[in-house]
Amino acid sequence: MKYVIIADLHVTIKGYSRSVNGIPEHIYYPTLNLHNAVDYAKENNATLIIAGDLIDTKDSVHQMVYNYLKDELEYAKNTVETYIVAGNHDYTVYNDQMFSFLKYVGIPVAFSGNPITINDCVLIGHHWDKEKIKEDFQNIDLETTRLIVSHFGLKEALAGNTSYKGGEFSISDFSEMKDTFLILGHYHKPQKVSDNIYYVGSPNPVRVDERDDEKRFILVDTDAMTIKSIPTIYPKYKTINLDKETELDLDEIKEDIVNNLSNYVFMIPDNYSKKIEIKELQKEFSGYVFTYDVEKNDKNEELIDDEEMVTLSKININSIQEEFLEKSGVPKNDYQKYIDVINQII
């Protein structure tokens, strides 16, 4: 059996979105890559699986996001056999009730507590409580199942191009699955975590710290037990390491941003003479130009987001979480349970 798997589209609309063929780019590129995944599945006689996080803002779906995404989902279900795994951005819970736009798209969706079996493949939806995910795994027959697709974090995996790891599960939790692929959504960095565990990754960068990723969707062949990466289409980031004397043609850069949809990351040393001009460029093209102030001997820095302007290498996320829990009066023995929930939310 063959399966095309795409994950973490995070279709959204932002105030600074550039237009591509009359469509905001944060809608255009993820839906374009979904469309291409559908076509690839058809060409290869494969089933299409969308492994969660179709949208970015789960509490309210912008009408334009819904319309374009629903059109592509209609195209998918009318073209190939299509299934969806619910991700943490695809639903919200209120008074113990789960609400999701995915209930209305006319495609089978694996929600927590309702796994879907397709031939030799099992789909398991996301849940905040890892015990609920475990329950869905308990009834899987590993003798006949060659592929499991789900949406959660692993401690051994990279969430992005950083050393931050905060998953609720470990590779050891799936040690019995030696002859079964586990393909996951949730972390945006495409990666092989072990011999049989992979993250698809997002098809286009969702945050600036994903700028060096080779984005993709994948083809899984459970007869040959192989995985093939198919590159996706998205605007690229250009990282420029400035020194004291670097000369920049700002008009050329502006033209590149507007006409070629390029994004720029400037690493600015303390002694750079035109720092003000670069900062002004960042203000003019907020969301497309990112700056980072680098000390002369600064190494191993990881830029994660223009708005936060912090580095994961400098911040121990777990220590911040533990400090917050301590101040909130949470017993130390319960820290990990709360940290797992926090990591799912962020």
What is each stretch, according to the model?
Residues 5-7, 48-53, 81-88, 109-113, ...:
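Active-site neighborhood of phospho(di)ester-bond hydrolases with catalytic His/Asp-centered motifs
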Residues 69, 75, 90-172, 203:
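Conserved catalytic scaffold of divalent metal-dependent phosphoesterases
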Residues 10-13, 56-59, 85-95, 114-117, ...:
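Active-site environment of divalent metal-dependent phosphoester hydrolases
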Residues 161-224:
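Conserved beta-sheet core of the metallophosphoesterase superfamily
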Residues 1-17:
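Acidic, histidine-bearing metal-coordination/catalytic regions of metal-dependent phosphoesterases
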Residues 43-47, 144-145, 261:
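Short acidic/histidine-rich motifs immediately flanking catalytic phosphotransfer sites
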Residues 19-115, 175-176:
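Core catalytic region of metal-dependent phosphoesterases/phosphodiesterases
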Residues 32, 222-346:
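Accessory, non-catalytic peripheral segments of nucleic-acid enzymes
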